[in-house]
Amino acid sequence: MKLNFYILLLCLSSIGITSWGRNATPTSHLTVLQLNIWQEGSIVEGGFEAIADEVAQVDADIVFFSEVRNYNGTCFISRIIEALKKRGKTYYGEHNPLDVGILSKYNISQQEIIYPKDSGCGSILKATIGIAGHTIAVYSAHLDYKNYACYLPRGYNGSTWKKMTQPVHNADSILAANRIAFREEAIEVFIENARQDIAEGAIVLLGGDFNEPSHLDWQEDTKDLWDHNGVVINWDCSSILCKEGFKDTYRTLYPNPVTHPGFTFPSDNDKMPVSKLTWAPDADERDRIDFIYFYPNQDITPISSMILGPSRSIVKSQRIEENTEDNFITPKGIWPSDHKGVIATFRISPQ
C-alpha cells in the first residue's frame, strides 16, 4: 500500500483547481470523491466533523454522499458546506429530500431528482456543472440495500441477514434474488437520462454506493477468494453500465481484482465494536460496492484512483490489515463510516 506517494499525487493533481465558483479558471484535472457517510455521521461519535475533515483532506472538486438523512428538519448540505468553510474550503450544493447529496467547488447550474420520481427504493440525484468549458452532468446514487444477494454464496440471507444452512452456488438463483431489489431499475433510469446528456455533448460521471458488487470482481480469477465459494456471476448494475459503454474508473486503472480488490465494505472503524460493522460475522464479506463511473470520450481521461479510509477491513469478525496493492489515503483522525470512500482524478481537456 503506497500511502505517501499517492497523497503527494493527490495534492499535485489539485494544482490549478483552486479557483471556485461561476467564474472559475478552466482546469485540466478534476478530482471526485464518493463516500457513504453512515447515517450522516451520526453513528460514530464526532462523525459529522470527521466527514468535514475527510472532505477537506481530499480537497475533491466534486463530492458524492450516500446516507444523507437531514435529521430533525436540518439540511445536511448546508451544514457540511458551513463546516467546510470553517476549514478554508468553499463548496456549493443544494438541499434535496433524498438520501444522497452533491457538493461542487463550481456553481451548480441545475439540480434535479432522477430516481425515484414516484415510487421505488434507492435514490439518484443529478447536478449540472460547468468546468473548463464543458458541461458536466454528475449523478449521485444510493441504490436499494435490500436483497443483498452477494451474501448468498457466503451462506447468509441478503434479506434477513441470518446465516443459512449452506451457501447458494447457482448464479441464476443468486441473480433472481438480486433482482427482487430495485437496483437494476434505478440504473436503467440513470442510463435513460445520461443518454440525453451524452447526445448533448456533456461529460457524464456517476458515483454511488450500489449495494451490489461489480461483475468485474466476480469472475474466474476470484471464484475461490473472499468466500465467493466457486461462484462466477455477472452482477446486474455493473453489467448494464458496461454494456452501455460506461467505465468503472477503479477497474479501468487497476484491471486485476486480485492485486487491487479495492474493497469498500465492510471497513474497519476503531471507534466501533466489530459487531456493529459486520452483517455476516462468520464470512469474508468484503466487496467493492462503492463506485465512480464515467462515460469515455476524447475530453476525459482517468489518471488515478485511491481508496479513502482505514487500510483495515472486517473479515469473519476480525479486524485485519489489507495485504493488497490498493492505494489508500488514510483518515486524518476519526473515521465516520462503515464503508471506505473512493477517489478518482480525471484529466479534462479544456474547450
Task: Report the location of each language-model feature.
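N-terminal signal peptide c-region/cleavage motif recognized by signal peptidases
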Residues: 13-16
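Active-site environment of divalent metal-dependent phosphoester hydrolases
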Residues: 40-42, 70-74, 121-122, 146-149, ...
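Structured beta-strand-rich core segments of catalytic domains in phosphoester-bond hydrolases
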Residues: 44, 68-157, 304-307
